[in-house]
Amino acid sequence: MHKLVSQLVVYRNLPADNLLEPLAAICARFAGGSYNREELTAEIYEQVHKLLDIGTVYGFDKNLWHNYLAFLLVSCENPFAITCEKVGACDGSVNQFAKHDFKIFQQLFAYDFSELERALEINCFSLISNYQAVVKQERRYNKNISDKVQALSTALEGAADADEFFACVTKFYHDYGVGKLGLNKAFRIAQAQQGEPELVPISNTEQITFDDLIGYEDQKQRLLENTEAFVAGRPANNVLLFGDSGTGKSSSIKALINKYYDQGLRMIEIYKHQFRDLSQVIAQIKNRNYRFIIYMDDLSFEEFEIEYKYLKAIIEGGLEVRPDNILIYATSNRRHLINETWKDRNDVTQEDGIYKSDTMQEKLSLVNRFGCTIYYGQPTQKEYYKIVCELAKKQGLELADDFLCAEARKWELHHGGISGRTAQQFINYLQGVADFSKK
């Protein structure tokens, strides 16, 4: 194995925490005969333990060795893979180097660990080649990655030669992408050791859809139309969803990533204390073959906060043009995002309804940079009852509408008033009581 791994060209720079190189070194020591049996066995178990951990995180099953090799291929962000991500497999000399590496990976897929197992009297490699994972709930592992990697692993197992192997891998790159941006829907920003911001995958995103959001049909339609245009490569606007709390603004944004992930949409969640990192984040993603929504939840600024100036410059106003593959979507309970004070109005005059205050104009200019503003208002009492009844049906609660409405009325009087969130909390309560009564 060590000889095979040492001959990789395109895939030579494997991730630092890869298992392939340590296993190759173990095989080299075994082949050379200069090893301590107990130490070598312990090292093998250490790598197998890591493989089992990876299998648990991603929900891998059956042949964990093949799954891991497939996972390694889709995780390596080398120039060849990133080019395939954008345009698919193109003619060029690099293809010959890639096929050379894929021939090696084919041999790794078929690698025979039996001699090693016999000599050390172990059977761990046999076990991981036919692994039966414990059934887990989807929220306990990244099902999105699991399904895609295992499908690729199965396809690569059936590849007759390096050309078929090449076709399978490059198709995956073009269809889904490569690395963490290709495999994950959503990200948050963390500060790396070097001080530069790092995109960290959010592995378990909420599986909400627009069908789960009752009402607000006009608002959802406007949001979908703008996002459809963006994903399709047509002109689209930055979006601000504003209005009363608990009305579904954040849920609408979350539903977008579930609807359009397969079409190349990715989402990056950012908080206002991270706005100064936006330029560096954009530099990391602007040349990738995805559409990015930079998402800001519950956005608002107090009088003393100046982070909004970073945001203004990024959205529109800086020297560098915002890339076509990036939009900013925000939610807020405030229409104008920034808290206004009477001091802001001291020098206000009004001509035909236009404020002349420089302070106010500076603050209001931020919201004007969102070309699409959508209002989510508090539902009426009738709409609230409709939301309650629809949610009850979706959850399988067989209760009369009159009873639901009467109880929902009592609930909202003590739980923050009428809203979609209040309705969902009420249904959660009813479902919990129903489940408890069955015990």
Region locations from a protein language model:
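Intrinsically disordered, low-complexity N-terminal extensions of AAA+/P-loop NTPases
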Residues: 1-157
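Interdomain "pre-motor" coupling segment immediately N-terminal to P-loop NTPase/helicase cores
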Residues: 135-199
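N-terminal pre-Walker A segment at the start of P-loop NTPase domains
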Residues: 202-228
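Walker A/P-loop nucleotide-binding motif
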Residues: 234-253
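AAA+/P-loop NTPase substrate/partner-engagement loops
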Residues: 259-292, 299-304
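Conserved catalytic/switch belt of AAA+ P-loop NTPases
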Residues: 302-352
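Conserved AAA+ ATPase "SRH/arginine-finger" region at the nucleotide-binding site
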Residues: 349-364, 371-385
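C-terminal alpha-helical "lid" subdomain
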Residues: 373, 377-439
